[in-house]
Design a protein with these regions (language model features):
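Glycine-rich cofactor phosphate-binding loops and adjacent beta1-alpha1 units
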Residues: 182-184, 225-327, 370, 393-396
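Conserved acidic E/D residue at the C-terminus of a beta-strand in Rossmann-like folds
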Residues: 218
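Short glycine-centered segments of the SAM/dcSAM-binding site in methyltransferase folds
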Residues: 89, 189, 292, 329
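N-terminal Rossmann-fold NAD(P) dinucleotide-binding loop
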Residues: 199-200
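Glycine-rich beta-strand-centered segment in the early N-terminal region that forms part
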Residues: 23-45, 54-105, 110, 132-133, ...
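C-terminal hydrophobic helical "lid"/dimerization subdomain
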Residues: 1-2, 10, 30, 34-35, ...
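Conserved S-adenosyl-L-methionine
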Residues: 208-213
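NAD(P)H dinucleotide-binding glycine-rich loop of Rossmann-like/cofactor-binding domains
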Residues: 98-193
Length: 396
């Protein structure tokens, strides 16, 4: 049996590359899954949601194999897999979804009802998401292959565009979903809170959807420069001033049509103090009456590192009366990746969006993953793509 290595969370602030079991066609509860496949991982990315766990801001246990952004080549298929074949190059949505339950049939694959005994929704390599082993590894098992996997039509073309296509597993559909949920359309003015990879992906998606002005706010100057590099207006929160005043300066009016929260529960206010509700409250302040707010930023039910007891259980101090008075619609939750990934794949393959350039992908080896985590945590304006087998280096 081949060997396997993966990125393992070992405690707050620590990840290591370790030898792990080679995957089998077995689910986390020990049941044989003939609907699954084994992938040789071609690309797997470090995500901001992984950082929440690594910072000790969740109940993730040491020993958890990280990674939910997985692209790979099929090397083994279960006996009931009919459509996906050995040798196919595929993108795996970060959601684990059965394709059979009510939610999956209604395209709400982010909250599949069967893949996680604890609650609706599953994901690879993530705490409380069903125990599915993560894909920041050389090899990984993907269940429900015929339903879940997106096959690339031309392997050679896909390898040439892999730094773009690897973003289909999470951040591009997530940013796009945030914008669609916020009602972004032709001519919209859009405020994106957060200039990390998801925020940058949301900004790129907003342009794809036809936004006239896309504004990105953050404290990180390097990430704001990255946003500006593909046409975004920016608000540097480290320089002070109210969001309202900044919008007035940029747009001539103190509000936007649509807003997207790409920050989540580790939001900070001026001075660096955590204030988990600050982004949501600011977005309600500046979104026009009858506007919509997309919230792909992660909010959790358990945060052991929160500053107060309420926030430790996901209870936030929201100015909800303002949102009600302005007839806002707020949309939250895991992105149903399968709703968008094929269309976004076609946009990439036909050069309608250059997401790798927008998020500034940086390819690293599996052994360099711990340093990638450290650099990302320091605010690097990059999207780290792990290349476990050197496949992307060979294709370059």
């Amino acid at each position: 049996m081949p060997s396997n290595r993966g990125v393992v969370y070992t405690g707050p602030g620590k990840v290591e590359v370790r030898s792990i079991d080679f995957p089998k066609l077995v689910d986390p509860r020990g049941k044989k899954v003939e609907h699954g496949v084994i992938l040789k991982v071609v690309a797997t990315n470090i995500c901001g949601s992984d950082q929440h766990m690594v910072r000790g801001r969740t109940t993730a246990p040491p020993g958890l194999v990280l990674g939910h952004e997985i692209t790979g080549e099929v090397i083994e298929a279960g006996r009931t897999v009919e459509v996906i074949k050995v040798g196919d190059l595929v993108s795996a949505p970060f959601n684990v979804a059965c394709g059979r339950c009510r939610n999956c049939r209604e395209r709400n694959t982010g909250v599949c009802l069967t893949v996680n005994p604890g609650r609706a929704g599953g994901a690879y390599g993530y705490v409380d998401m069903g125990g599915w082993i993560g894909g920041q590894a050389e090899y990984v098992m993907i269940p429900y292959a015929d339903f879940q996997l997106l096959k690339f039509p031309d392997k050679a073309q896909a390898m040439e565009k892999m730094q773009d296509l690897t973003c289909l597993t999470d951040i591009l559909p997530t940013g796009y979903h945030g914008c669609v949920s916020a009602g972004v359309t032709t001519g919209s003015t859009v405020l994106i809170s957060g200039a990390g990879p998801v925020g940058l992906a949301a900004a790129a998606a907003a342009f794809l959807l036809g936004a006239s002005v896309v504004i990105v706010s953050d404290f990180n100057g390097q990430r704001l420069a990255q946003a500006a590099s593909f046409g975004c207006e920016t608000i540097d929160l480290s320089k002070g001033g109210s969001i309202v005043d900044h919008l007035e300066r940029i747009l001539g009016v103190p509000e936007v049509d649509c807003a997207v929260d790409c920050v989540g529960f580790e939001a900070k206010q001026q001075g660096g103090e955590e204030q988990p509700s600050i982004v949501l409250n600011e977005l309600m302040t500046v979104t026009r009456a009858a506007g919509r707010i997309g919230i792909p930023g992660l909010y959790v039910t358990q945060d052991p590192g929160a500053k107060d007891e309420a926030a430790k259980t996901g209870n936030l101090s929201l100015h909800f009366g303002l949102g009600w008075a302005k007839s806002h619609a707020l949309f939250t939750g895991q992105t149903p990746v399968m709703k968008y990934n094929r269309g976004l794949m076609m946009a990439i393959l036909h050069d309608r969006i250059h997401i790798a350039k927008a998020v500034n992908t940086a390819v690293i080896s599996l052994d360099a993953a711990p340093q990638g985590y450290a650099d990302f945590d320091k605010g690097a304006a990059k999207k780290f793509v792990i290349d476990p087998h050197g496949s992307l280096t060979k294709a370059a």
